[in-house]
Regions:
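Short Lys/Arg-rich amphipathic alpha-helical segments
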Residues: 1-186
């Protein structure tokens, strides 16, 4: 039996994650003989703490060991299992990412535009197709396609005080910005 694919692992591990109201955000497999590694990155509307991650690591390890013992999967001579959250540098690619990061700062870059603009994440539309962006000091007029001023003109947050709606699309590259103070709940 070959080393399992990320798809196979996701199929096997999703019930464990969903039992804790978590989503598997990413599975990373690094094959290197005795030093192979399987990384499982989980997140949820309620962020998992270290105790929950430890419990899930135990459950996932037991499930993978049982599958290997049954001959359904093979991890080779040995592997290291890492169960964690994806971290702040994970791009926001699904509506749930935007919902979970409401009130945080986000750097947004649309394909074809050179620089990213920093906005604060507002409410996600009920149909999860758009998100409200609240201007910050680093915000421009608004991302293209947001219903904001056309022509690429820039304005400071002093000039541009109204939130804009950004349609969620694959052309949007967005990453949460690290903020050392508590974000406001506007």
């Amino acid at each position: 039996m070959a080393f399992p694919s990320t798809r196979q692992l996701e199929d096997v591990l999703s019930p464990i994650a969903h039992a804790q109201q978590l989503d598997i955000e990413h599975i990373k497999i690094t094959r290197a003989g005795k030093k192979s590694q399987v990384g499982v990155y989980l997140d949820g509307d309620q962020r998992p703490g270290s105790d929950m991650l430890e419990q899930l690591s135990q459950q996932i390890g037991e499930e993978l060991d049982a599958r290997e013992e049954a001959g359904e999967m093979s991890f080779g001579p040995g592997y290291t299992l890492e169960v964690s959250t994806p971290g702040l540098d994970m791009p926001l690619t699904h509506p749930r990412h935007w919902r979970r990061n409401r009130h945080r700062l986000v750097a947004i870059q649309l394909s074809g535009q050179g620089t990213a603009e920093v906005w604060r994440i507002g409410a996600l539309a009920d149909d999860e197709t758009a998100v409200v962006l609240v201007p910050t000091k680093q915000s421009g007029v608004g991302p293209a396609g947001s219903g904001a001023k056309k022509g690429g003109g820039q304005a400071s947050a002093k000039t541009r005080r109204t939130p804009v709606a950004l349609e969620l699309a694959p052309t949007v590259h967005a990453v949460v910005e690290i903020e050392f103070s508590q974000p406001p709940h506007a």
